[in-house]
Amino acid sequence: MSRKWPEYLRYLILVILALCAIFPIFFLLINSTKTQLEFSTNPLSLPTGIDWHNYTNAFDIIDRPILNSVIIVVASVFGILAFACMSAYAFTFMNFPFRRVLFVAVFALLLIPGVLTLIPLYLQIKRLDAFGINGNWGGLILPYIAGGQAFSIFVLRTFFGGISKDLVDAARVDGASEWHILGKIVVPLSLPVIVSVAVINIVPIWNDYLLPSLLLAEKYKTLTIALVSLQGNAQTHSSSQFGILMAAYVVACIPLAILFTFLMRYYVQGLTSGALKI
């Protein structure tokens, strides 16, 4: 019996951690359907009924910011994966001068704190106003693509190193171009780790507040900026806006929840296979 106590203790700790993780979601869900009176009376009580007006009001406020966030995330992640796959392929399967030195330089970028680049990045985007990207999606997408390269190249290059070079050489002998080898052989074999890299980049871009607040005009503001603005209104107007705020938080979580639901299998495969390669 005494041997089972450590096992029971582990289960107890896991249950406590699970409850701590679930409680914020539970708090959001129950308060997103409450009326103003119910929320001000007891925020922890269950709602007596379901009030969908909070969701309709919240969506009227954040519909455009959600669209902006989706456009920025999709374009940024597509750019990150496209350039990172090409770079990782070149570092793995192609011979060119200073290949190792360049890869070490790319890896060294991971050691630079992102906050140190904020002022130079801001000034650089402002100087690109002639290209029409200052204040709109392009002014944010380009920094995201550039900032996601170092980590993505490192992970993809590590995985690509486990692919048999004999397979690549055989394709070259058969007359396949480098583009054909990358698109028809390397990318399909690396799909799980590519999905993992995509998810790892999607989450911080979707949740980012600092860069959008610095670089975007009001018309192109993202979901995080809208949520912070709505939170300020809720605090100013007491409890009248908190139900709408909770509903907006729930809506903001839905895209990532759907993403993880459909991509979880590939995400886990990519993490485990990448760990084995490393």
For each feature predicted by the language model, list its residue ranges.
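Short, Lys/Arg-rich, polar N-terminal cytosolic tail immediately upstream
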Residues: 1-4
